[in-house]
A protein has these predicted regions:
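Conserved small/polar residues in nucleotide/adenosyl-binding loops
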Residues: 200-202
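Short hydrophobic segments within beta-strands
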Residues: 13-15, 96, 182
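A short, Lys/Arg-enriched amphipathic alpha-helix followed by its capping loop at the start of a domain
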Residues: 1-8
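Charged helix-capping and loop-helix junction motifs
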Residues: 107-111, 193-198
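A nucleotide-sugar donor-handling region in carbohydrate enzymes
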Residues: 17-22, 41, 119-194
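A structural signal for isolated positions on well-ordered beta-strands in alpha/beta enzyme cores
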Residues: 9-11, 94, 122, 145
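Conserved nucleotide-sugar phosphate-binding/catalytic loop shared by glycosyltransferases and other
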Residues: 9-50
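Active-site and donor-binding regions of nucleotide-sugar-utilizing enzymes
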Residues: 1, 27, 39-140
């Protein structure tokens, strides 16, 4: 859209707090994005309380700022909560990164994915496997759009804009001589036996 010289009027909603410690102060400018128009300020370590809090706050947001479409991203509790609220208000839902599956219903994110995809009017996928997953659950093909991997797209778009973080020089890191990874899966972090095995394989 940007490359075609067009724009869409939208509001960016962040369900957490403005002073969220997981948000770097320069995150949005680094990614060439506008800062959120509103921070709902919802936080809770309890998934049920978090879901309820986001739903109440987002309902108020949509009441004050009606929308034609609500675009939700990924597979978070916020993704599912906002999709439910939008659908209950008769607003179309678009899901970016739809069709992702682990086929493990013990994972909270898998529940989020299933519910969000089931409610969505437009499903934007990262790959053909995701398309197949949606088709196998009865999603109409005309509602599924393969748009590619937005993470890779974001890296490609920003890679020449961003400076190396200062910790590159502080730690003496050299290109090709380090490995950066994230470990955020409960199955890894909650099992003392799994974590050492992961490090060994790395």
């Amino acid at each position: 859209i940007r490359d075609r010289g067009k724009s869409i009027s939208y509001r960016l909603v962040y369900t957490g707090r403005k002073d969220d410690t997981s948000l770097d102060a320069s995150l949005f400018s680094d990614l060439d994005m506008k800062a959120p128009d509103v921070y709902l300020g919802v936080e809770s370590s309890n998934p049920t309380s978090l879901t309820a809090g986001i739903m109440v706050a987002f309902e108020q947001e949509l009441t004050e700022n009606p929308a034609h479409v609500v675009l939700v991203v990924d597979d978070l509790t916020a993704t599912m909560s906002c999709a439910i609220v939008a659908k209950k208000q008769g607003i179309k839902v678009a899901h970016l990164v739809a069709g992702t599956r682990s086929f493990d219903m013990k994972m909270p994110k898998e529940v989020n994915r299933m519910i969000t995809d089931g409610l969505s009017d437009y499903l934007f996928t990262a790959g053909m496997v995701a398309n197949r997953n949606l088709n196998q659950t009865g999603t109409e093909s005309e509602n599924v759009y393969y748009v590619g991997n937005i993470l890779i797209d974001t890296i490609r778009y920003n890679r020449n804009r961003l400076l190396k973080p200062i910790w590159f020089s502080v730690l003496g890191l050299q290109e090709g001589n380090y490995l950066l990874l994230t470990l955020n899966r409960r199955v890894l972090l909650n099992n003392k036996e799994n974590l050492p095995v992961s490090y060994t394989h790395l």
